[in-house]
């Protein structure tokens, strides 16, 4: 049985400054006996759980009182995972509101499919999905750096070098999406977050307010939300492709460099805004910008999609890669699945041995990137371990952590009683023997390698009687026996030698395996789960001794992997002539055969077909409650009181007056619902007329099945 919530709690705080401050990782915590992770990583302090302000608990998560964002149907709150003590972001979706709008339920399903299919360092990771009687919960990794829009508000504008770094990361993430056949369609400053390392994290893949993009009506009566970031062909209700994201990247780049939007009209009119985009009547740029930055920005904001560069061409731009020390981004490919060699053996062993999960369940869940509680525990523990090791340059990532810190004893113990008493008996004898053999000139040189005591200790030694010769012989033999036993056990040189002293000094400086009695503890090799081939049975010879047969290696049940394909093979799929259609499944059929592969081909000996194991669907399904069933109350405590005055509104919130002019917070879907009742459908041909009809989703059974993700075409 998996460990219950609250197991592994520590009596003391996990680390100072755990609420977001600088953590003290210079001195590693001692590992518990038989543990595969240090106590700071595997344990959670009770004070951290008690001090976290929350009003509800759902599963293994505490729903915090701090609100990170809010939309028309969802609220994003800060949460705490009780098994790891790590903070997460939880998107809470109201069931009663969502089930009234099929658009929301469809995009909710789409967001889960896309985020389980995509894996990129600049895209947020979906960890878990939960469902209660009244709400859906999407658990994602927390970005403590906040929103990029807040940073622009504080600095007024970003300098060119910082904006180039953010734009490079954004283009890399969008290029990865386009490679998988996904068009984001709602790239704006509000959807760009910053992690603890000041890197871009892209969010919002399904619940973005883009209903007006589909061409249902013309609801725009205010210059708010997505219209300011939409491409001209999108506003004109023409067929569009992945280049609409390139235009949105240009608008974001302009906002970073200037602090305003590139195209604005007063009073607002959608037709006037479109005409200004077509005429290239961009607002003036700062004079301190370089020529390369201006040329790249104008190329992104090209109104003609044929002349506008695609995402691969934008990623290879000279200005974007100027002064870039790393590998060229256009030559980097990120796999959508973790390989078996990249799994953290320490975390896997901890989850199987300490938390009680099956080894095959942990490996299959992580390799398939299926959002559930197992993936959340692995991701949070691995992230916590990486943060713990970040300040230690002498520890390599390829070495299992068990071989370095698992065997550290909790406290410094005294010497063994027998050895301590032996040193007391032989102290006077060794002192007199050394004084008789060595001349006084050698004592002045301070040859401490052959003298067990310092001068101060020699002067303060009490006088004892000379021991008998029989006792001296017995003590010498016993001392030699102890040294031989230690050397045979550890396999290291004598502790009194110079080599051993240097080796122990290096080991103790890095806080590696060492005991108080100067013995080096033998460390067995870690049990890393890996795929190996079956060994042929060994036939012993007639004269050789019988050898026990080795145990057969564990054959792990693998799942299919959607790896990124080569860039040259599929660039034509993203050509301007190819127009994407908005369907519930984001993966192209043309990419299916070229991107699927099995992880363990060596397991199928004699088989011509690859390993076919169906992908696991999400354990939690979205089933709508019946109208006749009475609602059940959730155990919700009253949240802490909120100040009545409006002086503490965060910058960039919908209620802040300063946030309404430059970076509006409303989306297209919100404005649609405000004016959808009064406006008539446009006479122009809608986008749906030129597309195949969307497949209706049955409201009674709505699940995140990754197998559906490869059937459709975006």
UniProtKB/Swiss-Prot annotation:
It comes from the Eukaryota. One of its GO terms (molecular function) is protein kinase activity. Its EC number is 2.7.11.1. Belongs to the protein kinase superfamily. CAMK Ser/Thr protein kinase family. SNF1 subfamily. It catalyses: L-seryl-[protein] + ATP = O-phospho-L-seryl-[protein] + ADP + H(+); L-threonyl-[protein] + ATP = O-phospho-L-threonyl-[protein] + ADP + H(+). PANTHER family: HORMONALLY UP-REGULATED NEU TUMOR-ASSOCIATED KINASE (PTHR24346:SF80), MAP/MICROTUBULE AFFINITY-REGULATING KINASE (PTHR24346). Keywords: ATP-binding, Kinase, Nucleotide-binding, Serine/threonine-protein kinase, Transferase. Residues 692-703 have a biased composition (Polar residues). Residues 624-635 have a biased composition (Basic and acidic residues). Residues 62-320 form the Protein kinase domain. The gene is Hunk. It is an enzyme of class 2 (transferase). It comes from Mus musculus. This is Hormonally up-regulated neu tumor-associated kinase.
């Amino acid at each position: 049985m998996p460990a219950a919530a609250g197991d592994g709690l520590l009596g003391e705080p996990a680390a100072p400054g755990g609420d977001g401050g600088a953590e003290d990782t210079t001195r590693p915590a001692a590992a518990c006996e038989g543990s595969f992770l240090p106590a700071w990583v595997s344990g959670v302090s009770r004070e951290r759980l008690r001090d976290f302000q929350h009003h509800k608990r759902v599963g293994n998560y505490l729903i915090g009182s701090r609100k990170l964002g809010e939309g028309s149907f969802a609220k994003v709150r800060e949460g705490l995972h009780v098994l790891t003590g790590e903070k997460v972001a939880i998107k809470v979706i109201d069931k009663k509101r969502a089930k009234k709008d099929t658009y929301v339920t469809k995009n909710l399903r789409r967001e889960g499919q896309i985020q389980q299919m995509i894996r990129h360092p600049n895209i947020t990771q979906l960890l878990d999905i939960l469902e209660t009687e009244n709400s859906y919960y999407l658990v994602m990794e927390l970005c403590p750096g906040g929103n990029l829009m807040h940073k622009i508000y504080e600095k007024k504008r970003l300098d060119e070098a910082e904006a180039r770094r953010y734009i490079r990361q954004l283009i890399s993430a969008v290029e990865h999406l386009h490679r998988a056949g996904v068009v984001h369609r709602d790239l704006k400053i509000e959807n760009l977050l910053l992690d603890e390392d000041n890197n871009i994290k892209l969010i919002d893949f399904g619940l973005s307010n883009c209903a007006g993009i589909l061409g249902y009506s013309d609801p725009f009566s205010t210059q708010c939300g997505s219209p300011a970031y939409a491409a001209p062909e999108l506003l004109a209700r023409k067929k569009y492709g992945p280049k609409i994201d390139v235009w949105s990247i240009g608008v974001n780049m302009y906002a970073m460099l200037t602090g305003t939007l590139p195209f604005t009209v007063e009073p607002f009119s959608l037709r006037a805004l479109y005409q200004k985009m077509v005429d290239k009547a961009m607002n003036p740029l700062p004079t301190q910008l370089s020529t390369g930055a201006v040329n790249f920005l104008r190329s992104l904001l090209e109104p003609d999609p044929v002349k506008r560069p695609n995402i691969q061409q934008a990623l290879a731009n000279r200005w974007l890669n100027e002064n870039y020390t790393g590998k060229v981004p256009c030559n980097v490919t990120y796999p959508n699945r973790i390989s078996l060699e990249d799994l953290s053996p320490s975390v896997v062993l901890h989850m199987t041995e300490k938390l009680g999960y099956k080894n095959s369940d942990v490996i299959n869940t992580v390799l398939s990137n299926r959002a559930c509680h197992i993936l959340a525990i692995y991701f949070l523990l691995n992230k916590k371990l990486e943060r713990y090791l970040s300040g230690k340059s002498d520890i390599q990532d390829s070495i299992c952590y068990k071989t370095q810190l698992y065997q550290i004893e909790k406290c410094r113990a005294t010497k063994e009683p027998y050895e301590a008493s032996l040193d007391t008996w032989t102290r006077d004898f060794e002192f007199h023997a050394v004084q008789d053999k060595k001349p006084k000139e050698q004592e002045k040189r301070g040859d401490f390698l052959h003298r067990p005591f310092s001068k101060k200790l020699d002067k303060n030694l009490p006088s004892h009687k000379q021991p008998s010769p029989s006792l001296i012989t017995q003590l010498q033999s016993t001392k030699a026996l102890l040294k031989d036993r230690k050397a045979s056990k550890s396999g290291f040189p004598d502790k009194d030698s110079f080599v051993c002293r240097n080796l122990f000094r290096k080991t103790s400086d890095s806080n590696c395996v060492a005991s108080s009695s100067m013995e080096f503890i033998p460390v067995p090799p870690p049990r890393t789960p890996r795929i190996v081939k079956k060994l042929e049975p060994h036939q012993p010879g007639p004269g050789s001794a019988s050898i026990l047969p080795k145990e057969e290696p564990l054959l792990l049940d693998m799942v299919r992997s959607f790896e990124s394909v080569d860039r040259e093979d599929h660039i034509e799929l993203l050509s301007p002539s190819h127009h994407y259609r908005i369907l519930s499944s984001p993966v192209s059929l043309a990419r299916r055969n070229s991107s699927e592969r099995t992880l363990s081909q060596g397991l199928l000996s004699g088989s011509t077909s690859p390993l076919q194991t169906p992908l696991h669907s999400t354990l939690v399904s979205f089933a709508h409650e019946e109208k006749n069933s009475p609602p059940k109350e959730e155990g919700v405590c009253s949240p802490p009181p909120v100040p009545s005055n409006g002086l503490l509104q965060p910058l960039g919130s919908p209620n802040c007056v300063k946030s309404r002019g430059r970076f509006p917070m409303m989306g297209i879907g919100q404005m649609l619902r405000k004016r959808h009742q009064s406006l008539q459908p446009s006479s122009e041909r809608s986008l749906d007329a030129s597309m195949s009809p969307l497949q209706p989703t049955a409201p009674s059974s709505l699940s995140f099945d990754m197998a559906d993700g490869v059937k459709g075409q975006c």
